[in-house]
Amino acid sequence: MVAPLLRELIAAEEPVLAAHDVTMWGYVVLLALDRSSMRTQAALAAAIGADKTRIIRDLDELQQRGLIERRPDPDDRRARLLAITDAGRTVKNAVQEEIQRGEERWLGNLSTAERRTFLRVLGSLTAGETP
């Protein structure tokens, strides 16, 4: 039941991401970095549920485009701290707004009560709770 919805969501988001030349993982990284202060690659990977080696290519690409920056960690010479740049925040905001407009169109098919219930249950599921 969830798989068809997920496929439709991904199909709806892919053109938005492509229009802004960002991958799904790149967008996830920008979202995570915008929600918190600088973090290490390992902490970021844990926060988004990815292996730290899996996101290296995405981090390299985001850095090359000036969307994130990597700085040496003053407390650990082996680690680099990651932060979103103003340009990265601009891209993240544009993608997020377009995706949210698409979600609003989908949710517009639901009554107010259905929408409230759907969002509550979805929030519970994504938080790992039992509805």
Please identify what each model-predicted range represents.
Residues 10, 38, 42, 60-123, ...:
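Charged, amphipathic alpha-helical coiled-coil/dimerization segments
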Residues 3-4, 86:
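Conserved residues at beta->alpha junctions
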Residues 57:
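Conserved alpha-helix in the HATPase_c
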Residues 7-54, 65:
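N-terminal helix-turn-helix DNA-binding core of bacterial DNA-binding proteins
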Residues 2, 30-33, 122:
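Hydrophobic structural patches
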